[in-house]
Amino acid sequence: MFLKKLIEAKKAYTFDDVLLVPNASWVEPKDTDVSTDLAGLKLNIPIVSAAMDTVTEKEMAIALARLGGLGVIHRNMSIEEQVHQVQAVKKADEVVIKDVITVSPDDTVGEAINVMETYSISGLPVVDNEDKLVGIITHRDVKAIEDKTKKVKDVMTKDVVCAKEDVEEEEALELMYANRVERLPIVDDENRLIGIITLRDILKRRKYPQAARDKKGRLLVAAACGPHDFERAKALIEAEVDAIAIDCAHAHNMRVVENVKKFKEMLEGTDIKLIVGNIATKEAAEDLIKAGADVLKVGIGPGSICTTRVVAGVGVPQLTAVAEVADVAKEHNVPIIADGGIRYSGDIAKAIAAGADAVMLGSLLAGTDEAPGQLMVINGRKYKQYRGMGSLGAMTGGVGAGADRYFQAPAKSHMKHVKLVPEGVEGAVPYKGPVSEVVFQLIGGLRASMGYCGAKNLKEMQEKARFVIITPSGQVESHPHDIIITNEAPNYPLGK
């Protein structure tokens, strides 16, 4: 029985075990389409940032969404702080600013100036006690007025150019240019102020034509939630997050599967998607799809900072895990995210060829400006802090979300009295500058691979790409060899 179990064990593969075979191709890399659809979340690049406290907070989520990807804000923080971060992403590129700072017509000019200086703005809508727009006051209106006790209503511009809520961005821009104004108040049918559009915000949005946005034109953002944390999920739903990622080391725990059903019920009537992970088998995929998962996240122990495979002896090499889950997921039209083990851009191509619809990145993004990890200098070179959510630091820091993720979650207040068994390590990764530079190289490598494989888009990549298994000698041959590298390439860091 036991010997048979060993003999019949299947061989499993990860990224370094295979290469993609070049095909006859009419496809140029520059002409490839790398967009993907995660159950209705339309991304222009197949990159999702990891829900780790040294990878994704609002800065990373904003930057990645502007590039066309998706950030998953980690949960090792209070519910209130996570909600605040989600809202910050949503407001970053809003077309219509809803939380408008206003003044009353009976306020003094001095009071209006104080408000402008406090919030560093050069103009304010003027509304009456019914929130009806009656005028606008700007620095130009007040800069020559010496008597600061004058009323706003005596100096404001009363003939205000405004628009209705359904105004299109192009129409708003034309109105502002035609009337030489930089702010366009938005009003309802009764002239009540709803919000404001600014020229600066429209021009800023146009800098990011590939941004991943919701139906209202706001940046997409996801947030992590514990498998039993219904209170957090409720708050995230109210914050209008685009996806909730059930963040768990072993999502095929049957209590987690049962809770997925409850989370799915909470999301009824919303457009919010439920991402569930992590898993590594077809059985897990079947159970979680049945429970209501919209997107599956694959990966047990492949991450650079994860020790699950040596501490627990459990895991499946990532490429095999992705392919096995994909075979089930594709039957149900459920997309999957390959989470972990990605070291080079070629690994992204291999993950997609094996059935992934997107990849989740941790270490490749942790060294960027937008990652929240601490910047440090080691031997004269810059690094940024990076740690696994199963590390002792993540388990005991913040709100102890790392411990909860690995089913070692007492109340945070009792953490100091509990012995923990970490499944991750803490360290540092080389500083890399802005995340946009890293993403440029990663997507460039993916496009190159698609050109070699003759795939115009990711669906064709999954259909046309072919694998070949390589030997250890083949792995050595795949990397630069018989040379001392004197200039480090941006997409091939030394020391890996």
From Swiss-Prot:
InterPro entries documented for this protein: Aldolase_TIM, CBS_dom, CBS_dom_sf, IMP_DH, IMP_DH/GMP_Rdtase_CS, IMP_DH_GMPRt
Requisite cofactors: K(+)
Binding positions (NAD(+)): D247, G299, I300, G301
Catalytic machinery residues: C306 (thioimidate intermediate), R405 (proton acceptor)
Residues where K(+) binds: G301, G303, C306, E477, S478, H479
UniProt keyword terms in alphabetical order: CBS domain, GMP biosynthesis, Metal-binding, NAD, Oxidoreductase, Potassium, Purine biosynthesis, Repeat
Pathway: Purine metabolism; XMP biosynthesis via de novo pathway; XMP from IMP: step 1/1
Activity regulation details: Mycophenolic acid (MPA) is a non-competitive inhibitor that prevents formation of the closed enzyme conformation by binding to the same site as the amobile flap. In contrast, mizoribine monophosphate (MZP) is a competitive inhibitor that induces the closed conformation. MPA is a potent inhibitor of mammalian IMPDHs but a poor inhibitor of the bacterial enzymes. MZP is a more potent inhibitor of bacterial IMPDH.
The reaction(s) this protein catalyses: IMP + NAD(+) + H2O = XMP + NADH + H(+)
Record-linked Pfam families: CBS (PF00571), IMPDH (PF00478)
Single GO term (MF): metal ion binding
Gene3D superfamilies to which the protein is assigned, alphabetical: Aldolase class I
Known partners and oligomeric status: Homotetramer.
Protein name as catalogued: Inosine-5'-monophosphate dehydrogenase
Species assigned in the record: Methanocaldococcus jannaschii (strain ATCC 43067 / DSM 2661 / JAL-1 / JCM 10045 / NBRC 100440)
Lineage: Archaea, Methanobacteriati, Methanobacteriota, Methanomada group, Methanococci
Gene: guaB
